[in-house]
């Protein structure tokens, strides 16, 4: 289940309250987040080296995005030259239709999947199931949440919200012959045995893409479990799906980005596996698919690209570091957001995918502490972009800016009238002094609760005397 039907960004507040009231979930996230932050801290022990790595990664992503249309054309040409068939999808529906057509052409009844956030974005599993095609997640975390009828809560560790006992309970309920245990090695072996035969039976393997190299027409896949390599080599057909922003100019761009990604995500110098796919199996090769397809998805990315400020959201390399350091995400987890991409990065990506009408609550679910921007390996100014999206949610597009989907959806007529009234009073001194004087005299009648903000804070009251009155009094006394 990957369509997030259980959760919705429109229900962010009740979902967040439910998460905060769940002590097991809070404890699971506390331990996991502490671990990931410590691993990243150790990986970047030298501040000068950290700055150099982040500077290099930022420069590469900005350079590649500045040439995005040209690089996409170059990628398509070189992929086709290598025997990789390239497909373009504007929407999730188009992406699913393309892959469904490939599957039906080859009589595929089961698909084994590697880690792919874009497949979650398009609701791939749900759509294939509607047409009688079984999809099985092979990433261990994704496999666990799929067995449980759950959804991922983190972009690199999908089952991070579950502890060992919960994983054991999931296996006991879904896998025959499993003996309940909380031994991590035993749990991993159980998952491995369940998945092994699926690779051989599957008619298609689906994967994501970490870096698509325009210069060579190659697809790079970063992983730790080996399931990605199995998905891309054992089935006769391999389909890779990715967003259009994942393209890089040349192979030499990959190592700096790879280093920034692994250190920021899991604190590793390198991952266990790094796969470079440059076409289907050739004559004389012993393994590999007969066909390789690449699906390039837009789904709102072009609109972000056309805005020079919002284009920075496309720099993301999906490391998850911003989530691990966010005081909101680390307390409520990923499900509360109700979006495929949770946490700080999800707040600035989701409006392009879903529109501001359904995501306006997310952009305000931030203290703007800046922790996300401080750890982002490609230096995305997430706090600045959140403030921009807050404005977009409540106001019309500024001159020269293309309106976003759902522009102004969070506009409040009462709030607008209140601000207009304040602006009028503030520009008319006599009216302003009279209003503040009345407010000071009536301060005892102020209600204790003024909306959600005062549910956990004391409502501020007007001062007994205004600043002007205090200054006049002091002047008289002197």
Question: Could you tell me what each predicted segment is?
Answer:
Residues 314-321:
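Conserved, hydrophobic alpha-helical core segments of structured domains
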């Amino acid at each position: 289940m990957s369509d997030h039907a259980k959760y919705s960004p429109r229900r962010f507040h009740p979902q967040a309250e439910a998460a905060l009231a769940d002590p097991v979930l809070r404890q699971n996230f506390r331990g996991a987040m502490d671990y990931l932050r410590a691993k990243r801290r150790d990986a970047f022990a030298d501040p000068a080296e950290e700055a150099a790595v982040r500077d290099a990664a930022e420069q590469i992503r900005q350079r590649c995005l500045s040439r995005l249309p040209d690089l996409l054309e170059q990628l398509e040409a070189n992929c086709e030259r290598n025997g990789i068939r390239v497909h373009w999808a504007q929407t999730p529906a188009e992406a699913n239709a393309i892959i469904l057509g490939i599957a039906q052409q080859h009589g595929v009844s089961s698909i084994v999947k590697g880690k792919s956030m874009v497949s979650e974005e398009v609701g791939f599993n749900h759509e294939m199931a509607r047409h009688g095609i079984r999809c099985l997640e092979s990433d261990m975390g994704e496999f666990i949440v799929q067995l449980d009828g759950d959804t991922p809560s983190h972009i690199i560790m999908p089952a991070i919200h579950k502890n060992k006992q919960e994983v054991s309970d999931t296996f006991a309920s879904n896998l025959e012959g499993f003996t309940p245990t909380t031994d991590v090695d035993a749990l991993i072996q159980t998952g491995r045995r369940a998945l092994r035969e699926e690779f051989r039976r599957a008619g298609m393997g689906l994967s994501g893409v970490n870096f698509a190299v325009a210069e060579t027409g190659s697809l790079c896949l970063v992983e730790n479990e080996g399931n990605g390599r199995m998905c891309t080599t054992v089935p006769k057909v391999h389909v890779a799906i990715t967003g259009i922003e994942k393209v890089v100019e040349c192979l030499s761009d990959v190592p700096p980005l790879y280093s920034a990604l692994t250190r920021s995500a899991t604190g590793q110098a390198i991952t266990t596996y790094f796969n470079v796919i440059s076409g289907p199996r050739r004559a004389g090769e012993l393994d590999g698919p007969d066909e390789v397809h690449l699906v390039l998805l837009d789904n709102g990315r072009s609109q972000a690209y056309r805005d020079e400020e919002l284009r920075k959201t496309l720099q993301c390399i999906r490391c998850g570091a911003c989530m691990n350091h966010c005081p909101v995400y680390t307390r409520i987890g990923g499900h509360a957001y109700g979006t495929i991409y949770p946490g700080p990065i999800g707040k600035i990506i989701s409006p392009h995918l879903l529109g501001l009408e359904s995501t306006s609550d997310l952009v305000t679910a931030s203290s703007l502490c800046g922790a996300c921007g401080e750890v982002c390996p490609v230096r995305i100014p997430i706090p600045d972009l959140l403030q921009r999206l807050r404005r977009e949610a409540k106001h019309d597009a500024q001159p020269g800016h293309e309106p976003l989907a759902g522009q102004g959806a969070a506009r409040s007529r009462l709030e607008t009238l209140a601000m207009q009234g304040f602006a009028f009073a503030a520009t008319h001194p006599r009216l302003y002094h009279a209003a503040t004087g009345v407010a000071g005299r009536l301060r005892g009648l102020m209600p204790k609760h003024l909306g959600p903000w005062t549910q956990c804070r004391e409502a501020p009251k007007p001062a007994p005397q205004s600043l002007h009155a205090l200054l006049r009094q002091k002047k008289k006394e002197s």
